[in-house]
From Swiss-Prot:
Family: Belongs to the apolipoprotein A1/A4/E family.
Name assigned to this protein: Apolipoprotein E
Protein source organism: Plecturocebus moloch
The entry's keywords: Chylomicron, Endosome, Extracellular matrix, Glycoprotein, HDL, Heparin-binding, Lipid transport, Lipid-binding, Oxidation, Phosphoprotein, Repeat, Secreted, Signal, Transport, VLDL
Subunit structure, as described in the record: Homotetramer. May interact with ABCA1; functionally associated with ABCA1 in the biogenesis of HDLs. May interact with APP/A4 amyloid-beta peptide; the interaction is extremely stable in vitro but its physiological significance is unclear. May interact with MAPT. May interact with MAP2. In the cerebrospinal fluid, interacts with secreted SORL1. Interacts with PMEL; this allows the loading of PMEL luminal fragment on ILVs to induce fibril nucleation.
Positions of post-translational Methionine sulfoxide modification: M145
Statement: the UniProt record of this protein carries the keyword Coiled coil: no
Length: 320
């Protein structure tokens, strides 16, 4: 009997434990996009702009009453367009900055990296454009429903937005990897450029050091007065040379100024002669016309006066 009761007790406890295990829900794993978005907040300017686009898209995905209202008034698509343009502008500027640093890298390597990065950038832009197009399509479909239930449209939009967000995450991850390779190439190119400069300047620096050591050793054996006198002679010769060059240069400048002034005076004289000739030509054109108009005017005045005189003469009367 005791064995039976013990078996029943064990079965009861096992059932209770199974129910408890069914009630306990598993912990939700954090979304990977949260970690990625945290990196955007402290990254490059294009990543900061992308973070603002992502925050706004996540708010749109809630499909709250305010979101639906702004979707119908095209407010959402306008905001997304501005955020998209800002992101692509900052990304283009960052790519140009890296391209300048890639100049020491081989042309083939630079072309390959640029092509891969451009393809990743195009995918991101296309998917962002797909988000905007899908929201614009939703607005058109809702407006066409004419007050009917839009629950199915909202569910379908939410599903599309989830898929698009996953695609955007993949695009951004791929783009960041491409940019990292691009940046590594730029860093390698900069290091190569510095090494090349060192290789070129190294022999010159060594020659300068050797020359300075030679001059120092030669001057060390001379008395101080002789060294000062030698330096003074060199300085005087240098100043005379500079002064001679300066005087020659001033003479050249004076000659050029005189030549320019002579040309300007010649051109001014030519312009005066041309103006006088043009004035005389105008006078020869218009003087006959003015004289003819004066003659016509005088004839017209005489005719008018004659007509007025004839009309003012007394009319003879018929009464005798």
């Amino acid at each position: 009997m005791k064995v039976l009761w013990a078996a029943l007790l064990v079965a009861f406890l096992a059932g209770c434990q199974g129910k408890v295990e069914q009630v306990v829900e598993p912990e939700l794993e954090p979304e990977p996009e949260l970690h990625q978005q945290a990196d955007w907040q402290s990254g490059q300017p294009w990543e900061l702009a992308l973070g603002r686009f992502w925050d706004y898209l996540r708010w749109v995905q809630t499909l709250s009453e305010q979101v639906q209202e702004e979707l119908l008034s095209s407010q959402v698509t306008q905001e997304l367009t501005a955020l998209m343009d800002e992101t692509m502008k900052e990304l283009k500027a960052y790519k140009s900055e890296l391209e300048e640093q890639l100049s020491p890298v081989a042309e083939e390597t630079r072309a390959r990296l640029s092509k891969e990065l451009q393809a990743a950038q195009a995918r991101l832009g296309a998917d962002m454009e797909d988000v905007r197009s899908r929201l614009a399509q939703y607005r058109s479909e809702v407006q066409a429903m004419l007050g009917q239930s839009t629950e199915e449209l909202r569910a379908r939009l939410a599903s599309h937005l989830r898929k698009l967000r996953k695609r955007l995450l993949r695009d951004v991850d791929d783009l960041q990897k491409r940019l990292a390779v691009y940046q590594a190439g730029a860093r390698e190119g900069a290091e190569r450029g510095v090494s090349a400069i060192r290789e070129r300047l190294g022999p010159l620096v060594e020659q300068g050091r050797a020359r300075a050591a030679t001059v120092g050793s030669s001057l060390a054996g001379q008395p101080l007065q002789e060294r000062a006198q030698a330096w003074g002679e060199r300085l005087r010769a240098r100043m005379e040379e500079v002064g001679s060059r300066t005087r020659d240069r001033l003479d050249e400048v004076k000659e050029q100024v005189e030549e320019v002034r002579a040309k300007l005076e010649e051109q001014a004289q030519q312009m005066r002669l041309q103006a006088e000739a043009f004035q005389a030509r105008l006078k020869s054109w218009f003087e006959p016309l003015v004289e003819d108009m004066q003659r016509q005017w005088a004839g017209l005045v005489e005719k008018v006066q004659a007509a007025v005189g004839a009309s003012a003469a007394p009319v003879p009367s018929d009464n005798h």
